[in-house]
Amino acid sequence: MTGENELENINENAAPLEGAEGSAGSSGAEGSDVHPIYEVPKPEEPEASAPAAPKKESVFLSDWFLMLALYVVTLAIHVLMTQVTTMFNLTPDEYAVTAVAAWFNGYDWSQTVSAGGYYGYFQSLFYIPVFWFVDDPMLQYRVMILINGVLMSFAPVIVYFLARKWFGVRKLSSVFMAIVCGMYPAYLLLTKYTWNETLCCLLPWVFALLMYKSLKSFKDTSHSSKAVFRQQLWAALAGLTLVAAYATHGRMIAMLAAGVVLELVVLFTMKRKVFAMSGFFSSVVVGFLADKMIKGYLQNVLWLKEQSDKASVNTIENTLGRIFDADPEKLMRFPQTLVGHFFYFISSTWGFGAIAMVLIISGLAMYYVTRNRAKKGAAELTADGRAKTYITSSLAMFCWFAFLVMGAIFVVSVGFKATSTVFDTRADTTIFGRYIETFFPVAIFPALIMIYRGRFSVMHSLAALITAGGIFALTELLTVPAVVGDGTTDKGVVSAMILGITPLKLGEGLKDKITETTFIKIIAVVMALLLAVVIIRLITVKKNSSMFNWVTIPMGALLMYTSLYCFDGYTVVQGKNASYGGEYVSEALEMIDDSGFDDVLAFSLKSERYVKAQFLFPDMHVRLASTLKKLNSQTARPDFIIADREDNLQLWSGDLWLVGDVNHNIHLYACTNAAREWCEEQGLELSAPASFEYSGRNIPSTSSVTRDGGAAVLPEGSAVYTNYFALYSSGGFTFTLRGTGLEQLSIALTSDKKANSIDYEIVSSDDGEMVLKFNAAAAKTENVQLKLTNRSGSPVTVTSVKLTRDSVAPLIILPATTAA
C-alpha cells in the first residue's frame, strides 16, 4: 500500500525545511505516513537585475535552538517552583515512592511503608542516586523534586518536535502548542511532590515520540539488517515504555491497554503498522513478566506478607475485585462518576475538552469516510492528481491514540473512584481529576493540529457547545447530588485531586465546601467561553481567517492562570504546612539522635508525622502501634516512643518516662532503663511515670495571664487550662493544683471538646494546694480538659497542675523497670 491517497491539503510548491525527511511523494512506504515539514511560501518578489543570495536562517530561529530554549525555560520554571517545597505533604503516596529508592540504598522502612498502599516503583528508580550524593534528608527531598523538573522539561520539547517533524506545523505555532501541551498545569503542579505523577505525565509523550520514530523507520523498504534493527528497536522501546508506565502506577494500565489496542486498531482498520509486531508484543510480554517479579519482590520486602491488603492497593487486580464485588444498590455511582470525570475534563481545560472530543471523533469518522471515497475514485484530488483524505493517516493514528488512552483512563479511574471507600465522605471522588488530567494534553494536541489545518468549522464549534451543555446537564442531574450529598455528612475535599477546576470556583477557597452554587459558577464560565468561540468562528468564516491563534493563545493564557492560581493557593501553602508538621517530630527525635538508641515506636501518630520521622532520621527503625492493644502486642520493647501530646501515655504505664513535651504537641518517652539513664546523663528532665504536669511557666492560658517566675498570674476574668487529652480506660484520677488564692477559681472539667461535663470532688484545699478527684466511666474518654478561671476581683497564681492515675499497671511489653 502507498500513501498516495492520504496526503494532506498543503501547498505542494512549498520547499521542505532543512532536515526534513524526504518529500511528499516519499511518504507512502508500507506502514508509514511521515510527512515532510513545509513552510508557507512567501509571495514572489519582482524580478531583480541579479538573483539575490539565499538568506541564511538565524540560529535563534532554528529548530534545535527553539527546542533548547523551551527546555531551559521550562526547567527554570520548575526550579523556581521547587523553592517552596520542603517536605512530604501527600502521604503515603510520596513516602512510598521514596521508600523504594531508600530500600535500594540499604534502608529498611518496611514497618512504616506497610501501613500505606502500594503505589508503584518505576519512578523510584530515578531517585536512587540521590542517596549516593546527598546526606541531608531535607535536601534529598528537594533534589528529588528537581529531578522531576529535569524530566518534565522534556515534555514541551517533544511536543514541539512532533508538531514540526511529524505534522509540519510552523515554528511559532509549534511553540504555542509546546507551551499549551508541554507546560500544562498538571505537569507543573503535580510534579512538585515525590509521588508518581512525573512519569505518568511524561511517558505518554515518550510513547508518541516512539510512534513517530517507528513510522519513520518504515520508510526504509530495503529490508536491510540496519532497517530491520531500527524498526525492532523502536517497537521494543515502545513496548517497554508501556510496561514502565504500568510499573509507575497501577492506573497506567490504561496506557498499556491503549498502546496495545492502538497497534491492533491501526492494523485492522488502516491496514498499516505503528510498530513492528514481533518486537512490540515481545517486549510487552517480557516487560510485563519482569514487572510482575519486581513488584512482587518489593511488595514482599516493603509491604510485608502480613500486610497483603495494603500491598494490593492501586493494582488492577484490586480494582477489578472491587468492581465485581460492588454493591448492586450502589451501581448508580458508576454513571455519576463517569459524568463527573467528563465534567472535570471540560471544565479544567476551560471548555477546550469539549472541542477536543468533537474534533477527535469527527476527525476519525471523516478520515474513514474520505478514505473510502478515495478507494472508489470519488475523492477530491490535489494539484498533482492524488486523492485527499480529511486528515492524514498519521494524524488519524494520533487521534486513535488520544481516543484510546483517554477512554482507557476514564474506565480505570471510574472503576477506582466509583468503588472507593471514601465515596460518601469525600466530595472530590466523583470529579476526581488527578488520575485523568495527566492525559489531557495528549487529547489537546491532535485537536490543535486539526485547528491549525483548518479542520475546525462553525459546526464543530456548535457541536462542542452542545456537547458541553449535555455533559453539564447530566452533571446537574447525576453528579451534583453525589458531590454535595444530602446534608447529613460534611464531605471533605482534597484540593490536590481537583486543582484544575479551582480557579473557576470564583471567590471560593481551595478547601471550601463544594456546593450547587460552585457547579453553577463553573458551568456558567465554561459555557460563556464556548459561546465566545462560536461567535468568533462565525466572524472568522466571513473574513476567511484561521482560528488557531484565537483558540490557542487565550487557552494558553487561561491554563497559565490556572497554574499560577493553584501554585499560590496550594503548592506554597502546602509547602509551609509540610514544614510545620515536620518540625515537632524533628525536634523530638533530635533530642536522642546521638544516643545510640535507634528503635523508636510511633504511637497513634498520623501518617504525615511518622513518615517524616522515618525519612528525616533514616537510620532509626520506626515501628507503629495505633492503639494500646497493639502497643501491648509488640514482641519487643522499643527504646523510645513518640506520641501526640493528648495521648499522655505516661498515664497508662508505671515505667514510661516523659523525656520531652515538644511545644505542647509531641511527647517523647524513654521506655528502657538504659534509655532513661542516657537521658539523665544528658541532663534531660524526666517526668515521673503515671502522671503529667504543667508548670506555671508552660500551662496554656488566655492572653491576659502573665508569668512571674514559675507562676502564672490570673487577673479577673482570665483562665489557664490543659490541652485536650484522652483517657484510655475507666478508673480514678487525681488533679493536684498548687498556687495561691486557688479557692477563688471557677473549675470546669469537660470531655468531647467541652460538650460534656465530668463530675469531680474537691477532697482537700489548704496551704496553697487543692486536690480534686474524678472517675472516668467509659473505656475511652476523648478531648478531656481542665479549665481554671478567676471569677474574683483578686489575682490568683497557679504554680503547677498535675494529673495522676490512681491505679497504674505496667504495659505488657514493659513488664519490669529493670529492663535494659
Each predicted region: which residue ranges?
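Membrane-interface alpha helices of multi-pass inner-membrane proteins
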Residues: 178, 228-249, 260-263, 281-288
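Short acidic/glycine- and proline-prone juxtamembrane loop motifs at membrane-interface regions
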Residues: 92, 116, 189-200, 251
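Perimembrane helix-loop-helix junctions
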Residues: 215-217, 221, 254-285, 357-381, ...
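Transmembrane-helix signature of polytopic, membrane-embedded enzymes
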Residues: 159-183, 201-202, 229
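Membrane-lumen/periplasm interface segments of specific transmembrane helices
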Residues: 268, 275-372, 401-416, 470-486
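Transmembrane signal-anchor helices characteristic of membrane glycosylation enzymes that use polyprenol
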Residues: 60-91, 183, 282-298, 404-413, ...
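Membrane-proximal lumenal/periplasmic loop motifs of glycosylation machinery
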Residues: 82-92, 105-128, 142-145, 149-150
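Transmembrane-helix motifs of polytopic, lipid-linked glycan transferases
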Residues: 146-168, 206
